[in-house]
Amino acid sequence: MSKQVQDAYIVAATRTPIGRSHRGYFRNTRPDDLLVKALQAVLAQVPSLDPKAIEDIICGCAIPEGPQGLNVARIGAVLAGLPTSVGGITVNRFCASGLSAIQMAADRIRVGEAEVMIAAGTESMSMVPMSGNSPSLSPNMFLNDENVGIAYGMGLTAEKVAQQWKVSREAQDQFALESHLKAIKAQQAGEFSMEITPVEVTDRTANLETGEVIAKTRTVSLDEGPRPDTSLEGLAKLKTVFAARGSVTAGNSSQTSDGAGALVLASEKAVKQFGLKPLARFVSYAAKGVPPEIMGIGPIEAIPAALRYAGLKQEDMDWIELNEAFAAQSLAVINTLKLDPAKVNRMGGAIALGHPLGATGAIRAATVIHALHRHQLKYGMVTMCVGMGQGAAGIFERV
């Protein structure tokens, strides 16, 4: 007997600040601990919810090994003090892992298999490098010349996009500058305060002469990446790092980062049962494949599909969070789809704010949901390119 599809509502959404990898806030903080911070904070937003009603936790993680291996979703659930009856599964669609976690959680509710779910994402690029610790790509991949692009470094794919879509170095640097300017302006205006959960971190320094270790604890509540001193002149001085005569630099690429985000999703039945207040309805999701060597164009395919599934038009979108993996691919997407620049990344993007890979989808979803409420807008979208040639997009409606 078929079940009627029901709506899935986001009733709570939060994230940690985003720290710079290796030398930043969370360089010594494990990714499972970051996840715990996000889980505990998001559940604190819905105190009337019985944790035993949570069916499962789905957590995105792009490189699920080392400190974020061994099913970090289940580990996070246990460390966060959730009932042992709450399951946990870690999912990996690289940069779209967190967004895919939201889609999977929503679908469980929409088909009637769950009343309450948690979707999350966590990533520590300080502790687990983007390439992983011991990657091993099948040698069979190189038997066909058409498959070679699957092994390209992300920066090289951005160079290819810049060449094919004719995105100049000057345009990329200008886009990067605007990302920082928008992020700084949003921070100064307190625009991120609703979505960010402050996190305590402990810094330890050692006296080399005495061996004494001094620990200092502080609370961080802002993303660490935005740089007030960013300028076109400074960006123009940076050398290209992926191609000798290229245009992609560290300055017009996303930052490697650490962070986590989490959302609570509930059915209409659970909303009424526990007295929850919906923030948004999950509307649609699409993931599409593209040639791996130009993976940055993924949103060009995913965005129209997500809109089609939702029965909406591009102009219906009021707020678009387009992950800035690289300025080159961001501009290629914006120009090809003719996205309204005024609606895209109004508070900056990954070039300024950072990109903790598998956590980014959950983090950007928290951003768009709270932004829709702050500005009384209706529809928002989160979209990103995905390594090895994919794109993903998800649409949310303010309730």
Model-assigned labels for residue ranges:
Residues 111-164:
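Flexible glycine-/small-residue-enriched beta->alpha junction loops
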Residues 15-17, 28, 32, 37, ...:
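N-terminal extracellular/periplasmic Venus flytrap/periplasmic-binding protein-like
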Residues 59, 156, 192-195, 283-352:
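Active-site pocket-lining segment
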Residues 29, 61-115, 149-156, 228-255, ...:
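Conserved catalytic cysteine-centered active-site region
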Residues 2-76, 80, 160-169, 179, ...:
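Conserved active-site "lid/cap" helical segment
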Residues 2-31, 230-297, 301, 308, ...:
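Condensing-enzyme catalytic core mediating Claisen C-C bond formation in acyl metabolism
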Residues 91-123, 162-192, 262-269, 334, ...:
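Active-site-proximal alpha-helical scaffold in enzymes
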